[in-house]
A protein has these predicted regions:
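Cofactor-binding loop segments of dinucleotide-utilizing enzymes, especially the Rossmann-like FAD-
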Residues: 10-12, 56, 81, 109, ...
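Radical SAM [4Fe-4S] cluster-binding motif and immediate context
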Residues: 172, 179-345, 352, 357, ...
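Conserved C-terminal portion of the radical SAM core fold
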Residues: 75-77, 103-105, 245-257, 279-288, ...
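Radical SAM enzyme core and accessory elements
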Residues: 1-9, 30, 50, 74-75, ...
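Glycine-rich beta-alpha loop elements in corrinoid/cobalamin-binding modules
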Residues: 40, 44-171, 379-385
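Mobile, glycine-enriched helix-loop/loop "lid" segments at the mouths of ligand-binding/catalytic clefts
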Residues: 156, 167-187, 388-409
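Short glycine-rich His-centered loop
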Residues: 4-34
């Protein structure tokens, strides 16, 4: 084995317009094309000399081109998802036909949750990595034997071996990782990435890993990143911001794509104070527990927008999903965000445990009261590996196990005796109609379009898609929920599942 294997890190082209990879919290084909950066793959890419990161979907690299690229490498690290897994296995077969000697590792939540099932799906997978995989694949590329790599699962003598888990990285180790943005500069075209409610072009990366919140539906803290909140030092984050602004002077904002950015008040304030002299706009994920002092410091430091998962306007549903937040907290948070001038993109979910027709109506009215700048309304999805999946399976509310159709579009798969999938989809339709077709919201959208040509073009495109998808969802609901391609996410509102 050479000193370092020629290594390709791949976010595969599972489906057309598929945002399924290495930071998308809800892998799916987007009806409105949008892509998050493959942040997780950047860290080993920066530690393996001569490596290359290929993010296929946003760069319009198809199966055939991917197979050709793989011919030049000795080691493939493929980030897979539950939604894209079957497609990724088929692609791997083609890759191995073209390069039989290629060594292959699968990484990501699916392998972490189902290591044996993943390995048994294809003889071409040499090993998978459970949990964080930064150092596991780096060690293998440098020649370390599999039986010495923590977190690896692999076949040996006709059985599957699971090595001891690797301890999670903490501040000192996180600070030693390469900057994600160094790899963006080396391997990616940042203009290929867009998220409708962010200012594009944008760049995103993590300032921390993990989330102590216990939301039963949220995949990342229950799989790869964990519930232990582990932070990069403030100085380390600030240096990556400085590099980003130097590398990409064309960007309009930086998005901090942590599971939750504002976990601790003192850190959020310190980061914001260090950001202030750099004079850049930024957005982040947030929970609604921050008070006025913290929000004011963040606004003064350049914060433009928060993505906040409010989920429901029903207090009991919030308790059922262990949200750790209340409707009263949400109201105060929104009031203070308006005071300091920070916009909010609100996430809401229809179909969580305890949902009824009455609670759907309550959540719609609650959302209108909060009056976020933009919203996403999703049907509840029970991702494998989450407490919600275990609960829905145990209680018999999973209508089908499949999370997506053959094109990667999300399928509603939860149904209750008192609330059908079609009724929940109708709730999504009414939610968007009642929210966006209010005079003050229409005026807010028109006003933004009048003064910003970029916003005007974006809004026109999204409005066209909004009406098309609205029509398709209504048709799906009228057919009783059996249409093969229900549109669950909305134009201009898809967050990729941040909560």
């Amino acid at each position: 084995m050479p000193d370092v294997l020629r290594t390709l890190l791949l976010n595969p082209p599972s489906f057309e317009n598929f945002d399924g990879g290495a930071s998308s919290r809800w892998p799916a084909t987007r009806e409105i094309e949008s892509y998050w950066y493959p942040v997780w793959l950047t860290y080993p890419a920066g530690m393996i000399p001569g490596s290359r990161l290929v993010d296929a979907s946003p760069h319009k690299i198809d199966w055939q081109q991917t197979v050709q690229v793989c011919k030049d490498y000795e080691f493939l690290v493929l980030f897979t998802s539950t939604v894209g897994f079957d497609s990724d296995i088929k692609l791997l077969t083609k890759i191995k036909e073209a390069n039989p000697s290629l060594k292959v590792a699968f990484v990501g939540p699916h392998g972490h949750i189902r290591p044996e099932e993943t390995l048994n799906a294809s003889e071409h997978i040499d090993f998978i990595v459970r949990g964080e995989f930064d150092y596991a694949v780096t060690e293998y590329a440098h020649g370390k034997p599999l039986d010495q790599i923590l977190g690896a699962s692999y076949r040996k003598d006709g059985r599957i071996v699971h090595n001891a888990p690797r301890p999670q990285l903490h501040t000192e180790e996180l600070d030693k990782l390469p900057f994600a943005t160094d790899i963006y500069k080396r391997d990616l075209q940042i203009e290929r990435y867009n998220v409708p409610f962010l200012l594009n072009p944008f760049v995103s990366f993590y300032t921390s890993r993990g989330c102590p919140a216990l939301c039963t539906f949220c995949m990342w803290p229950q799989t790869i990143s964990g519930h232990a909140w582990r932070v990069r030092s403030v100085d380390n984050v600030v240096q990556e911001v400085k590099n980003t602004l130097e590398y990409f002077p064309q960007i309009k904002e930086i998005f901090f794509d942590d599971d939750t950015f504002n976990i601790r008040k003192d850190r959020a304030i310190e980061l914001s104070q260090k950001f202030k002299p750099l004079k850049f706009q930024w957005s982040c994920t947030a929970r609604c527990h921050s008070k006025y002092e913290e929000l004011k410091a963040m606004a003064d430091g350049g914060a433009r927008l928060f993505i906040v998962g409010f989920e429901s306007g029903d207090p009991q549903i919030l308790k059922n999903i262990k949200k750790g937040a209340t409707v009263e907290m949400a109201r105060e948070f929104m009031k203070n965000c308006r005071k300091v001038g920070i916009k909010v993109h609100g996430d809401f979910i229809i179909g969580l445990p305890g949902e009824t027709k009455e609670t759907i109506n309550k959540t719609i009215e609650f959302a209108k009261e909060l009056d976020c700048e933009t919203i996403q309304v999703s049907l509840a999805h029970a991702m494998p590996g989450t407490e919600l999946h275990d609960q829905m399976t145990k209680e018999g509310f999973l209508r089908v196990e499949a999370l997506a159709d053959s094109g990667g579009h999300q399928l509603p798969h939860i149904e209750y005796p008192h609330l059908s999938k079609a009724e929940m989809m109708d709730g999504v339709n009414r939610f968007y109609d009642d929210y966006y077709f209010r005079p003050k919201v229409v005026w807010r959208i028109v006003k933004d379009a009048l003064w910003d040509s970029h916003e005007r073009k974006r809004l026109y495109h999204e409005a066209t898609e909004f009406l098309r998808l609205r029509s398709e969802r209504l048709q799906w609901a009228r057919q009783g929920g059996d249409h093969p391609k229900p549109m669950v996410s909305m134009a201009g509102t898809s967050t990729g599942g941040n909560d």
